[in-house]
Amino acid sequence: MTALRALWSEMQDTCTSLGLMLSVVLLAGLARVVARQQQLHRPMAHAFVLEFLATLQLCCCTHELLLLSEQEPAHPTWPLTLIYFFTLVHGLTLVGTSSNPCGVMMQMMLGGMSPEMGAVRLLAQLIGALGSRYCIGALWSLGLTKYHVSERSFACKNPIQVDLPKAVIVEALCSFIFHSALLNFQEVRPKLRIHLLAALITFLVYAGGSLTGAVFNPALALSLHFKCFDEAFLQFFIVYWLAPSLGILLMILMFSFFLPWLYNNHTINKKE
């Protein structure tokens, strides 16, 4: 009987946590609808608000998802299932935003976004990432589950379990793979593309999560590990900001310069 009560309590906490994340998604969605209606003739302000709300939603849900996954050590597939599901949710609800400075950088380098618009989106992501800490802190202070009470302090939990060069390689490689897929899946049907990207993100988290957390998103990393940035800024700056940016740069160089050059050389050699 005691075991059943403990299991029931665990299920209640899990359902409450899932409900909290879905509520954040719903409220952010309603705010986006209002923003679209009110700011149709101000593209900069419109882009800022949408990017802010998208980053806020992503960071808040990831805070709660990380907390929930830490409480289920006996179910190794449970966190991955949640990651896949909420990646689908974000993919369906955050259309037109990136919630990732690396995504903005990629669009600017490929000529798909002006520097001014890029700066506005980056600022929105920064504010959204920092604002999510206050938002999720206020929600946790309500003590809706037993997990929230013990996690409200946002103490630094260093996710880097390898030395610095390996951590840089992991984050750069994750960023390279994800954004390469993002770039090359443009022609895939939207419904299928969302599932493919969700599966890819889940795989990357599974492969690199135990090494660095496999964040490959500077804004999300700042929100999740703000205290760690304060205590070991240089290490976290290199791993979570520079490394994903390096992955983007390598991806651009490969697909925009190296592969076309290789193809042209091959074509010339065949003609000769």
From Swiss-Prot:
Q: Where in the cell is it found?
A: Endoplasmic reticulum membrane; Cytoplasmic vesicle membrane; Cell membrane
Give the record's membrane topology: Multi-pass membrane protein
Bilayer-crossing regions: 15-35, 48-68, 76-96, 168-188, 196-216, 236-256
Record's InterPro entries? AQP11/12_channel, Aquaporin-like, Aquaporin_11, Aquaporin_11/12, MIP
Motif NPC location, chain numbering: 100-102
Show the catalytic activity.
H2O(in) = H2O(out); glycerol(in) = glycerol(out); H2O2(out) = H2O2(in)
Give the residue ranges of motif NPA.
Answer: 217-219
Spell out the molecular function terms from Gene Ontology.
channel activity; glycerol channel activity; hydrogen peroxide channel activity; water channel activity
Q: How is it modified after translation?
A: Not glycosylated.
Keywords tagged on the record: Cell membrane, Cytoplasmic vesicle, Disulfide bond, Endoplasmic reticulum, Membrane, Transmembrane, Transmembrane helix, Transport
- Cytoplasmic side residue ranges read 1-14, 69-75, 189-195, 257-272
The tissues in which it is expressed are: Expressed in retina specifically at retinal Mueller glial cells.
Q: A GO biological process this protein is involved in?
A: protein targeting to membrane
Kindly report the protein's main subcellular placement as a broad class.
Answer: endoplasmic reticulum
Q: What role does this protein play? A: Channel protein that facilitates the transport of water, glycerol and hydrogen peroxide across membrane of cell or organelles guaranteeing intracellular homeostasis in several organes like liver, kidney and brain. In situation of stress, participates in endoplasmic reticulum (ER) homeostasis by regulating redox homeostasis through the transport of hydrogen peroxide across the endoplasmic reticulum membrane thereby regulating the oxidative stress through the NADPH oxidase 2 pathway.
Assembly with partners or alone? Homodimer; disulfide-linked. Homotetramer. Can also form homomultimer.
Q: Per its record, how is this protein called by name?
A: Aquaporin-11
Q: Give the source species.
A: Equus caballus
